[in-house]
Amino acid sequence: MAKKSQIAKNKRPAKFSTQAYTRCERCGRPHSVYQKFHLCRICLRELAHKGQIPGMKKASW
């Protein structure tokens, strides 16, 4: 979990575009965040398994 200060800092607009980075909206993780969902890979997987993301299902081939 990210600190509350880091989450608050991320919500503010960055002074420069290179300073901006994505964080998971659910847990605050800074790495491997899917921009379309604003979730990290771990949270995305958990929610997909629970069926809480519409249109997403487990792939099988």
Curated annotation (Swiss-Prot):
* MF (Gene Ontology): rRNA binding; structural constituent of ribosome; zinc ion binding
Report the cofactors. Answer: Zn(2+)
**Which InterPro entries is this protein grouped with?**
Ribosomal_uS14 (IPR001209), Ribosomal_uS14_bact (IPR023053), Ribosomal_uS14_CS (IPR018271), Ribosomal_uS14_sf (IPR043140)
Q: Does the keyword Transferase apply?
A: no
Q: Which GO terms describe its cellular component?
A: small ribosomal subunit
Pfam families of this UniProt entry? Ribosomal_S14
* Residues at which Zn(2+) binds: C24, C27, C40, C43
Keyword annotations: Metal-binding, Ribonucleoprotein, Ribosomal protein, RNA-binding, rRNA-binding, Zinc
Which PROSITE patterns does the entry link to?
RIBOSOMAL_S14
The record describes how the cofactor is bound as: Binds 1 zinc ion per subunit.
GO BP terms, alphabetized: translation
The UniProt similarity line reads: Belongs to the universal ribosomal protein uS14 family. Zinc-binding uS14 subfamily.
Q: Summarize the protein's role.
A: Binds 16S rRNA, required for the assembly of 30S particles and may also be responsible for determining the conformation of the 16S rRNA at the A site.
Q: What is this protein called?
A: Small ribosomal subunit protein uS14B
This chain's source organism reads: Levilactobacillus brevis (strain ATCC 367 / BCRC 12310 / CIP 105137 / JCM 1170 / LMG 11437 / NCIMB 947 / NCTC 947) (Lactobacillus brevis)
Gene name of this polypeptide: rpsZ
